[in-house]
Amino acid sequence: MKRIFLFILTNIAVVAVLGIVASLLGVNRFLTANGLNLSALLGFALIMGFGGAIISLLISKPVAKWSAGVRIINDAQNADEAWIVETVRKLADKAQIGMPEVGIFEGAPNAFATGAFKNSSLVAVSTGLLQGMTREEIEAVIGHEIAHVANGDMVTMTLIQGVMNTFVVFLSRVIGYAVDSFLRRGSDNNSGPGIGYYVSTIVLDIVLGFAAAIVVAWFSRHREFRADAGSAQLLGRKQPMMNALARLGGMQPGELPKAVEAMGITGGIGKWFATHPPIEERIAALQNAPA
């Protein structure tokens, strides 16, 4: 979850900064100088949309290291760290990707992988994960993160985020222009976009941005099932990943974690933005997957 949440958050920040810079440079005035130029707007939306997503991808490793406080293991300080590095190396070789950077961060059980390229990624695990799981379960979690890298999930999510960003930028400005034109009907002042355009665009950027985040989260949930299966394939068996998922959910295999039980009964908007499927669904998918 850290991996996708950080990517989405960074992407939103980058697109917002690009939008502010574009406004200061008079891009909005250019787009509406002689009516709304849809071709120019589409080009602008593509640059903004994919530019923000690609920049977010390229800076994902340093942002993740900084935000999570990751300590990179350059020289193992103990047997546990040496085992983690060797496990990552072994699974990376099986997945036929370059050796990732390996790191540890303080916190509750969690792990993530990130990076723009398969052969220069980062895999990090938390101290809570190392203290609360068996080595077999930790290996399964690392396999899950290696599978994300091998499957090119960060690049896939970048493309999806780029498409959604383009949609948000384009549609918000088309609607903003329509609202501004309606508010200024009969006015002789056509020197450029008015306050209606700017207010509408800002509001729609936020609203449509949330809608886009729901779509991105939906794709992310489906990639999690594939990464779970990838871990099972790398380890040659499904049970370690199932046990790790059960442990993360605070349950024994076959039982539902209390948090998921509550969410399943009441539903709510949180499910729409979740980047990971409920744990019991992931375990069931692994159980039903071919051996």
UniProtKB/Swiss-Prot annotation:
Report keywords, A-Z. Cell inner membrane, Cell membrane, Hydrolase, Membrane, Metal-binding, Metalloprotease, Protease, Transmembrane, Transmembrane helix, Zinc
Instruction: Name it.
Output: Protease HtpX homolog
The prosthetic group or cofactor this protein requires is: Zn(2+)
Record: active site: 145
Task: State where it is primarily located.
Answer: membrane
Q: Which PANTHER family match?
A: PROTEASE HTPX (PTHR43221:SF1)
The cross-references to CDD domains, in alphabetical order and at most eight, read: M48B_HtpX_like
- Pfam families per the UniProt record, alphabetical: Peptidase_M48
Q: How is the cofactor bound?
A: Binds 1 zinc ion per subunit.
The organism named in the record is: Polaromonas sp. (strain JS666 / ATCC BAA-500)
